[in-house]
C-alpha cells in the first residue's frame, strides 16, 4: 500500500499530516509535512521537485497550428492520489471525533435536564404530604 510514497523513501506514510503543492517555473514542488512530536516547534517536512510534462497539442483557432502546454507529471499525480487518501482519512477521523464529542455534550445536556425534571417532581411530592 502507498507504493508511490514508499518509492520516495517515505517508510511510514501514517506519519503524514498534510502536503502542499506549488508550481515554480517548469517544475511542480511537492512538500510533505509530518505530524509534530511533543516538544517540536516545527513539523518535519520533505520536499520533492517534479519537472512538468510538456505536450504539443493542436491549437483551438483555425490555422493556428500547434502549441506547447505543460501539465503535472503522471508520477506526481499518483503520489498526490495516495496523499489525498491519507489526508482525507485523517479528516474523517477528526470529523468523527468531533461528532462523538458533540453527541456526548448533547447527551449530558439531556440527562441534566431530565435529572432536574425528576427532582422537581420529587419536590412536588414531598410538599404535598
From Swiss-Prot:
InterPro entries reported in the protein's UniProt record: UPF0325
Xref: NCBIfam families: PRK13677.1
A Pfam family of this chain: DUF3461
Family to which the UniProt record says this protein belongs: Belongs to the UPF0325 family.
Name the UniProt record assigns to this protein: UPF0325 protein Ent638_0703
The species this protein was found in: Enterobacter sp. (strain 638)
Domain of life (superkingdom): Bacteria
Amino acid at each position: 500500500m502507498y507504493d508511490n510514497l514508499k518509492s520516495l523513501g517515505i517508510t511510514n506514510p501514517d506519519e503524514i499530516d498534510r502536503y502542499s503543492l506549488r508550481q515554480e517555473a517548469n517544475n511542480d514542488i511537492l512538500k510533505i509535512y509530518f505530524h509534530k512530536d511533543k516538544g517540536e516547534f516545527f513539523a518535519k517536512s520533505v520536499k520533492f521537485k517534479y519537472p512538468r510534462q510538456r505536450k504539443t497539442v493542436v491549437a483551438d483557432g483555425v490555422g493556428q497550428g500547434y502549441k506547447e502546454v505543460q501539465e503535472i507529471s503522471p508520477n506526481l499525480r499518483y503520489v498526490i492520489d495516495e496523499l489525498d487518501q491519507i489526508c482525507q482519512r485523517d479528516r474523517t477521523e477528526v470529523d468523527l471525533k468531533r461528532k462523538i464529542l458533540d453527541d456526548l455534550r448533547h447527551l449530558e445536556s439531556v440527562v441534566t435536564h431530565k435529572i432536574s425534571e425528576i427532582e422537581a417532581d420529587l419536590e412536588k411530592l414531598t410538599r404535598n404530604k
